[in-house]
Amino acid sequence: MNTGIIDLFDNHVDSIPTILPHQLATLDYLVRTIIDENRSVLLFHIMGSGKTIIALLFALIASRFKKVHILVPNINILKIFNYNMGVAMNLFNDEFIAENIFIHSTTSFYSLNYNDNVINYNGLSRYNNSIFIVDKAHNIFGNNTGELMTVIKNKNKIPFLLLSGSPITNTPNTLGHIIDLMSEETIDFGEIISRGKKVIQTLLNERGVNVLKDLLKGRISYYEMPDKDLPTIRYHGRKFLDTRVVYCHMSKLQERDYMITRRQLCYHEMFDKNMYNVSMAVLGQLNLMNNLDTLFQEQDKELYPNLKINNGVLYGEELVTLNISSKFKYFINRIQTLNGKHFIYFSNSTYGGLVIKYIMLSNGYSEYNGSQGTNPHMINGKPKTFAIVTSKMKSSLEDLLDVYNSPENDDGSQLMFLFSSNIMSESYTLKEVRHIWFMTIPDTFSQYNQILGRSIRKFSYVDISEPVNVYLLAAVYSDFNDEVTSLNDYTQDELINVLPFDIKKLLYLKFKTKETNRIYSILQEMSETYSLPPHPSIVKVLLGELVRQFFYNNSRIKYNDAKLLKMVTSVIKNKEDARNYIDDIVNGHFFVSNKVFDKSLLYKYENDIITVPFRLSYEPFVWGVNFRKEYNVVSSP
């Protein structure tokens, strides 16, 4: 990134609509590398650093020169990108060609380029003279999307902007694919990756490190947001290596069925969804069912003496005594004395959402826009509510998050408990969450951090003095109380194999984290930095941000104010051109956010420049919608 741009800002105000200094500095680098040099870039910016806005600002600049195709994983993230495109346009302050920008979900992109599962090679000519931006680049390999990207790269010889950060689930393999896509050379994976008998023994070898440094030199942008303006995190439970874990000791009932499932069904325990299920809750014979349709067809079937299922509805005293789930027993007991909103991560597997719904209802918590809980708990005269988000939930997710994140819900009075499967681990932002729970151990510690990052991020909290509580729950045997202080104590398989599933999973993640951190440090070391005057293509965007910052603190100045002129000439060296720019923003009534007047427009009044507050007003039912083509980014769902 161009550190010379960062040096232009002093005490940058982040609380207004803004482009952050590191985003502008990165934008300069992307323009120079991708547009000027026609080289691909890996934008490896850790979660919460604003990768999406950087990518969209770059797309707006690039649209003046080429077609830009943006590829996102699914419909939900496509909606986020379309919304953020509007934000980026409002901050852009320069010309762009909206018709040259196309946003695709992977499914629509597949349909566009495949006929009967075969790539339509003749149609790929549409991507000549294009730039591809790929969001969540670590997720596109090993499937048709990754195959198609490789074909387009080889056939069309175009540059890619790959967006990634955390998590890279299987780091060495994924990184190998990224190198292959970004470079002009074909990669022999056998030469750069060493493999042992286990997944945790997959490593980038020394030749791989050298290949990475040689082929991606000058093509990496690494950034991690400083840990400031965030609440402190309070981890609960006993010390476990460098974190804390809550041991939830299983009842005899849960432990018995847990062991039956482990013996009968689990051949690759680390990746077996049955173990995810029984570590969260056991359901007797239903533990062995992997089909929800079968599950919902059972009528008045007794699972345990105090638990039955009828057409997909669980009922019985066991949902309150909770011998079926040590994790939910801890959770239900703990939340009774806690204030604020909760975010609870779980793996849906087969029956996770089903168990959660009926445990919550049976213990007095009501379903948001659904069934009321038994003897409902109340807040401000209204029932305490929960919602469950899974991959099947699409159309109503944005509306649900609007309610959850609204200022009126800061105390959880509208929606207190948000349960989510992995669909929420990336891209979404949650606000004012005071309690984060892990009912399932995530697949990687990067994913663990990503889930935390949905909530614990800049601008998500009004009061950062109050801590955020994190509970990582592990189902353990009734007599298990091991202190886990060093990975070196668990290097032998026979010692690991006897451990509870959740503890094994945590150790597995920690072993993987070593390799992940090693690769991250290499990427950080390779990140390109320089100090140059801003690229001509971003000058107006940069000046717009400098003007916004200046008029946040200045409500009224003389037209020939020396400080304003000095700021503009730090970018536009010619004083006459700088004065012309000031004339343009004043006569064009540039939009700013002022600390006194809030949303304002610049005006000339006598010999002064003043900030004039404004408010949009309208008569009921007289909204006008502008359908002019140039204002609409072309996208495919």
Curated annotation (Swiss-Prot):
Gene Ontology terms for molecular function: ATP binding; DNA binding; helicase activity; hydrolase activity
Xref: InterPro entries: Helicase/UvrB_N, Helicase_ATP-bd, Helicase_C-like, P-loop_NTPase
Main location: virion
Keywords in alphabetical order: Activator, ATP-binding, DNA-binding, Helicase, Hydrolase, Nucleotide-binding, Transcription, Transcription regulation, Virion
UniProt-listed SMART domains: DEXDc, HELICc
TM segment ranges: none
Domain Helicase ATP-binding: 32-185
Positions bound to ATP: H45, I46, M47, G48, S49, G50, K51, T52
CDD domains listed in its UniProt record: SF2_C
Annotated EC: 3.6.4.-
Localization terms from the record: Virion
A GO cellular component entry from the record: virion component
Pfam families noted in UniProt: Helicase_C, ResIII
Alphabetical list of SUPFAM superfamilies matching this protein: P-loop containing nucleoside triphosphate hydrolases
Span of domain Helicase C-terminal: 327-507
Impact when changing V462A: In strain: Garcia-1966
Motif (DEXH box): 135-138
Domain of life (superkingdom): Viruses
Similarity comment: Belongs to the helicase family. VETF subfamily.
Function: Acts with RNA polymerase to initiate transcription from early gene promoters. Is recruited by the RPO-associated protein of 94 kDa RAP94/OPG109 to form the early transcription complex, which also contains the core RNA polymerase. ETF heterodimer binds to early gene promoters.
Subunit structure of this chain's protein: Heterodimer of a 70 kDa and a 82 kDa subunit. Part of the early transcription complex composed of ETF, RAP94/OPG109, and the DNA-directed RNA polymerase.
Protein name: Early transcription factor 70 kDa subunit
Name of encoding gene: OPG118
